Amino acid sequence: MTHQTHAYHMVNPSPWPLTGALSALLLTSGLIMWFHYNSSTLMFMGLTTMLLTMYQWWRDIIREGTFQGHHTPVVQKGLRYGMILFILSEVFFFIGFFWAFYHSSLAPTPELGGCWPPTGIHPLNPLEVPLLNTSILLASGVSITWAHHSLMEGNRKQMIQALLITISLGLYFTILQAMEYYEASFTISDGVYGSTFFVATGFHGLHVIIGSTFLIVCLLRQLFYHFTSTHHFGFEAAAWYWHFVDVVWLFLYVSIYWWGSYFSSMISTTDFQSLSSGSNQ
């Protein structure tokens, strides 16, 4: 940095964008192979290369920002804009999933029995595990904010405690979601309901796992004194990402679990009973 005449970071050539793209291709292709041919070899190869890429890319960024001093205020401003655009792109992913769900549920076709949920589908009760998951993520949003304020106030002990609580809640959410998938009476291949349900909630679950990994890295960095009260964008980005995951879950809960499953099935049952009583009269 002593020989630079500008505040920007001229990044050295890095192989990680290429290896990340190739591992994403392997992971996606492996997922297709697993779904259609019950072969998980390619998927685990993609997952392994993805994890290795994440580790080494994260290592390089930490070295550049913490030990080499390349993350100047100007660079941090660019990183903030980049993180905002990344989260915005993720928002559009979920808009697509919600669009597919509402397109199918607001005007169900005759093939679905003209009702939503489709005939033969027994939706999950939103007042059981989904409601517990909602409270868990809301609590984790409070604890991550506590961690952020503790970091800005220089309270290292409370920051570590709050971060541990957030990570624990995130892992607990993932375990409950996996149990819910295992016990569900329908699968991803059960028509448009199963597809939209598992793709939307599964993609969100993947984001929870990624966010938990992000927070674990932040916890390790805090233990090694990488963050200060004025220089902690790595943690700030993780907190933004976690709040995004929280907000998306609220929309998922209200749309898919409550309105699209439980509430719609109650309306369909009431309509059916009223029609039956009318025909009997």
UniProtKB/Swiss-Prot annotation:
Keywords: Membrane, Mitochondrion, Mitochondrion inner membrane, Translocase, Transmembrane, Transmembrane helix. It is found in: Mitochondrion inner membrane. GO terms for biological process: mitochondrial electron transport, cytochrome c to oxygen; respiratory chain complex IV assembly. It catalyses: 4 Fe(II)-[cytochrome c] + O2 + 8 H(+)(in) = 4 Fe(III)-[cytochrome c] + 2 H2O + 4 H(+)(out). One of its GO terms (molecular function) is cytochrome-c oxidase activity. The keyword Transmembrane applies. It holds the Pfam family COX3. Its main location: mitochondrion. It is a multi-pass membrane protein. GO terms for cellular component: mitochondrial inner membrane; respiratory chain complex IV. It comes from the Eukaryota. Its EC number is 7.1.1.9. Residues 1-15, 67-72, 153-155, 224-232 are mitochondrial matrix. InterPro entries: Cyt_c/ubiquinol_Oxase_su3 (IPR024791), Cyt_c_oxase_su3_dom (IPR033945), Cyt_c_oxidase-like_su3 (IPR000298), Cyt_c_oxidase_su3-like_sf (IPR035973), Cyt_c_oxidase_su3_a-hlx (IPR013833). Residues 35-40, 106-128, 184-190, 257-281 are mitochondrial intermembrane. Component of the cytochrome c oxidase, the last enzyme in the mitochondrial electron transport chain which drives oxidative phosphorylation. The respiratory chain contains 3 multisubunit complexes succinate dehydrogenase (complex II, CII), ubiquinol-cytochrome c oxidoreductase (cytochrome b-c1 complex, complex III, CIII) and cytochrome c oxidase (complex IV, CIV), that cooperate to transfer electrons derived from NADH and succinate to molecular oxygen, creating an electrochemical gradient over the inner membrane that drives transmembrane transport and the ATP synthase. Component of the cytochrome c oxidase (complex IV, CIV), a multisubunit enzyme composed of 14 subunits. The complex is composed of a catalytic core of 3 subunits MT-CO1, MT-CO2 and MT-CO3, encoded in the mitochondrial DNA, and 11 supernumerary subunits COX4I, COX5A, COX5B, COX6A, COX6B, COX6C, COX7A, COX7B, COX7C, COX8 and NDUFA4, which are encoded in the nuclear genome. Belongs to the cytochrome c oxidase subunit 3 family. This is Cytochrome c oxidase subunit 3. The gene is MT-CO3.
